[in-house]
Amino acid sequence: MKRFSLVAVAGAVALLAPLGAAASAQAAASVPFTINEQITLGPDGQPVLQTFTATRPLCPEGTYVDTVQATQPARAQGPDHSGQFTLIVRSVYTCDGGRGTFNALKELIGTFSGPDTVTATGPIQLLGGTGAFTDLRGHGVDTGSIDFAAGTATGTDTGFIVRS
């Protein structure tokens, strides 16, 4: 009886071993990414040009559009007593060269760091797109700053693509 049990266990381990290797291969498939964003602001403080560069497997460069979907506190109320505010931002990145677009969702905590400057940080999720990026999935951190006096803003998104 013990002999049969040992043989059965050994057989089960042999059958399940490839599943462990497959899980390890999937975990090893996550790839780091960096997106560097540059924004030129108009006289009203709104973006007039938004460009980016990125590391592989994303496209090397392109343009993007941010849409603010929610703010807390509400825009009319301004920042809360701590000087902070939260933005939920949907970004659509369009690759130069026609490789497609990819989408991101960001939850940014902004802080006024001077009379004309804001710094922000928060999580970013990469959520599919078109063309080469249909199955794109990833996560990371967005950090950035706005200098209204200079009319510029920059951002850096870093993280891992877990499926593409």
Spans of model-derived segments:
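Secretory targeting and sorting signals
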Residues: M1-A27
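Beta-strand-enriched cores of mature, soluble protein domains
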Residues: Q26-S164
